[in-house]
Amino acid sequence: MNARGLGSQLKDSIPVTELSASGPFESHDLLRKGFSCVKNELLPSHPLELSEKNFQLNQDKMNFSTLRNIQGLFAPLKLQMEFKAVQQVQRLPFLPSSNLSLDILRGNDETIGFEDILNDPSQSELMGEPHLMVEYKLGLL
């Protein structure tokens, strides 16, 4: 055995990172890096995609700031409390909900959009056994 000891032998050895493959054809090392998630690496496909995803949130913020400037702090707080109360009221899990009261609060009850035509609950793909859905929602399963 060398007089310098085991620690110096480890220092003199080639680092593992130099032995690993690098470049465009490198395989993903699951043991060191874990599972790769492609969803996190995707960029928006179009510049307007992010704007469209956040449209309702931005619209609500703009309405709240306008209300605050015109009527004071009470009006947006009251409207936000009404939004929370309306969002908590739901039907049973197997029944479709139109959220009409939320549409009325936002002023969307007088507009017709593509979701009004293409979002028919009778054509939903997520139909299930009503008793199982209620038991799952209540945490009995």
UniProtKB/Swiss-Prot annotation:
Its main location: cytoplasm. It holds the Pfam family UMP1. InterPro entries: Ump1 (IPR008012). It is found in: Cytoplasm, Cytosol; Nucleus; Microsome membrane. Keywords: Chaperone, Cytoplasm, Endoplasmic reticulum, Isopeptide bond, Membrane, Microsome, Nucleus, Ubl conjugation. The keyword Transferase does not apply. There is a cross-link at residue 39 (Glycyl lysine isopeptide (Lys-Gly) (interchain with G-Cter in SUMO2)). One of its GO terms (biological process) is proteasome assembly. It comes from the Eukaryota. GO terms for cellular component: cytoplasm; cytosol; endoplasmic reticulum; membrane; nuclear speck; nucleus. Constituent of preproteasomes, but not of mature 20S proteasomes. Within the preproteasome, may directly interact with PSMB1/beta6, PSMB4/beta7, PSMB5/beta5, PSMB6/beta1 and PSMB9/beta1i. Interaction with PSMB8/beta5i is controversial. Forms tetramers. Belongs to the POMP/UMP1 family. Molecular chaperone essential for the assembly of standard proteasomes and immunoproteasomes. Degraded after completion of proteasome maturation. Mediates the association of 20S preproteasome with the endoplasmic reticulum. This is Proteasome maturation protein. It comes from Bos taurus (Bovine). The gene is POMP.
